[in-house]
C-alpha cells in the first residue's frame, strides 16, 4: 500500500505541477482573472466555479472569430498588420457580428463602401437591341 497523503494521487509523482484553470479548460483567456472580476463586480452574491470558465470560452471564441475575419480583410488589402479599419470591415460585413456589435463605434474604423446601384454606370457587356423604342 502506498501512502499518498491527503491528495490521494500517485505517491511521488513529479509531474503533478500546479495547472491553471485556463490550462485545464484548454483556453488562452485567464479563467482566474475573469472569476475575480465577476466576484468584485457585484454582479451576484456568489459566482459558481463553471461560470468564469464558460465566460472565458465565449470571449475567446468571439475574439478568435473577429481576428480571423480581420486577418482576412488585412490580407485582402495586401497588408500584414491588422488595423482598426480591418476590424470595422470584418465586423460590419458579418451579419451576426454586426448585429451583436451594432451600437459599437470603432475609432479610426471608417465606413463601409457602398454605392447605390442607380449611381453606378450602366453595364455595357451586351449591346442592347438596336432600335428598340425608336421604331413607330
Swiss-Prot record:
Bias category Gly residues: which stretches?
1-11
Q: Which GO terms describe its molecular function?
A: DNA binding; protein heterodimerization activity; structural constituent of chromatin
N6-acetyllysine PTM positions: 6, 10
- Find motif ([ST]-Q motif) and give its ranges: 133-134
Q: Which SUPFAM superfamilies match?
A: Histone-fold
Give the GO terms filed under biological process for this record: DNA repair; heterochromatin formation
Q: How is this chain modified after translation?
A: Phosphorylated to form H2AS128ph (gamma-H2A) in response to DNA double-strand breaks (DSBs) generated by exogenous genotoxic agents and by stalled replication forks. Phosphorylation is dependent on the DNA damage checkpoint kinases MEC1/ATR and TEL1/ATM, spreads on either side of a detected DSB site and may mark the surrounding chromatin for recruitment of proteins required for DNA damage signaling and repair. Gamma-H2A is removed from the DNA prior to the strand invasion-primer extension step of the repair process and subsequently dephosphorylated. Acetylated by ESA1 to form H2AK4ac and H2AK7ac.
Question: In the record, which positions carry N5-methylglutamine?
Answer: 108
Q: What is this protein called?
A: Histone H2A
Organism annotation = Mycosarcoma maydis
Record lineage: Eukaryota, Fungi, Dikarya, Basidiomycota, Ustilaginomycotina
The encoding gene: HTA1
Amino acid at each position: 500500500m502506498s501512502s499518498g497523503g491527503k491528495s490521494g494521487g500517485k505517491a511521488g509523482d513529479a509531474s503533478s505541477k500546479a495547472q491553471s484553470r485556463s490550462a485545464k479548460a484548454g483556453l488562452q483567456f485567464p479563467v482566474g482573472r475573469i472569476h475575480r472580476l465577476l466576484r468584485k463586480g457585484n454582479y451576484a452574491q456568489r459566482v459558481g466555479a463553471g461560470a468564469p470558465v464558460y465566460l472565458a470560452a465565449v470571449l475567446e471564441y468571439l475574439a478568435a472569430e473577429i481576428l480571423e475575419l480581420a486577418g482576412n480583410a488585412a490580407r485582402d488589402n495586401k497588408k500584414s498588420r491588422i488595423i482598426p479599419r480591418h476590424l470595422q470591415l470584418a465586423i460590419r460585413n458579418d451579419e451576426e457580428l454586426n448585429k451583436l456589435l451594432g451600437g459599437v463605434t470603432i475609432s479610426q474604423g471608417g465606413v463601409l463602401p457602398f454605392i447605390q446601384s442607380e449611381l453606378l454606370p450602366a453595364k455595357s457587356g451586351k449591346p442592347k437591341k438596336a432600335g428598340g423604342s425608336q421604331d413607330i
